[in-house]
Design a protein with these regions (language model features):
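A short, conserved, highly charged catalytic patch centered on acidic carboxylates
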Residues: 1-86, 90-107
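Extended charged low-complexity segments that act as oligomerization/scaffolding linkers
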Residues: 113-116
Length: 117
């Protein structure tokens, strides 16, 4: 798939699952959601939404918090996966990438209620 086709398919996407599938196909990622998170590679953990406003810092922070919850599960849970170097937050219109280690003081912190949905 070329980049123009990737953009066209994303624009036509109707669900979060479709957005995820388009990214997986474009980046040639086989995915397994058995650990209850979106796409994962040892380099990148993806968190997808259908259509969020990434310019709204509260919306972006909410998606980031969900990603950090998944990173914490990777760190302390039973999944035999490494913590990826990057987090990619994406929807059908935009994406944001950040280094995972910049957030370690959050996902390693026990003072947060990590059990809340």
């Amino acid at each position: 798939m070329i980049f123009e086709e990737f953009k066209t398919k994303l624009k036509a996407a109707k669900t979060e699952e479709t957005v995820k599938a388009i990214y997986a196909r474009y980046f040639n990622i086989d995915y397994d959601t058995s650990d209850m998170h979106d796409l994962y590679t040892p380099q990148v953990l993806f968190e997808f939404k259908y259509d969020k406003n990434f310019q709204d810092l509260k919306a972006l922070a909410t998606i980031l918090a969900q990603s950090l919850y998944y990173v914490r599960r990777l760190k302390y849970g039973n999944a035999e996966k490494t913590i990826p170097y990057f987090l990619c937050l994406a929807d059908k219109n935009e994406a944001s990438i950040t280094e995972t280690n910049k957030w370690s003081s959050y996902y390693s912190n026990d003072s947060y209620n990590w059990e809340s949905p």
